[in-house]
């Protein structure tokens, strides 16, 4: 039939970017005061979300530093892990995930007080794995301070993230 369109009951309603952002803010807020290792992301704040990208910001504080007074490499690696997994979790909600590969290249030092913009991209989501990358940029000059890569496997019979309790990272 000419001019026929699907009924509104058949259409899939996609969440808006504002709804996706609100969900990620709730997830990251659950990390505040966490007693597990996710606590290293408690100062991260999501600022932009799409189905293939998550942008967060973090002000570097003393607890994020190494003995040389710059952002600790382990902090950067953990943020790569957590933020890229959350980027995948924007669309993959029903599966648990585990890291298969995580790599970070450290390009420039970041000091206390610097604001980092952390952008995670979902490159591909397959049946059993997801591939991501992550860029850390100093907001003051836009220079890239670190570049990460993270490959995740989907775990059979494991729950996805629960926004209510912030579990499953």
Swiss-Prot record:
Keyword Hydrolase: yes
Top-rank taxon: Eukaryota
CDD domains: PaaI_thioesterase
EC code: 3.1.2.-
Keywords (A to Z) from UniProt: Hydrolase
Pfam families per UniProt: 4HBT
Alphabetized Gene3D superfamilies for the sequence: Hotdog Thioesterase
Protein name: Putative esterase F42H10.6
């Amino acid at each position: 039939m000419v001019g026929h369109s699907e009924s509104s009951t058949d259409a899939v309603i996609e969440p808006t970017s504002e709804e996706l952002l609100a969900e990620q803010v709730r997830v990251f807020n659950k990390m505040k005061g966490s007693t597990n290792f996710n606590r290293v992301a408690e100062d991260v704040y999501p600022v932009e979300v799409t189905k293939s990208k998550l942008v967060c910001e973090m002000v570097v504080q003393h607890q994020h530093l190494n003995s040389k007074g710059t952002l600790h490499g382990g902090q950067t690696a953990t943020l790569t892990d957590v933020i890229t997994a959350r980027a995948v979790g924007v669309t993959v909600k029903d599966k648990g995930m585990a890291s298969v590969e995580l790599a970070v290249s450290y390009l420039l030092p970041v000091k206390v007080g610097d604001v980092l913009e952390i952008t995670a991209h979902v490159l591909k989501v397959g049946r059993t794995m997801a591939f991501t990358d992550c860029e850390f940029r100093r907001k003051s000059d836009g220079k890239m301070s670190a570049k990460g890569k993270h490959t995740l496997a989907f775990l059979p019979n494991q729950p996805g993230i629960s926004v209510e309790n912030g579990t499953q990272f």
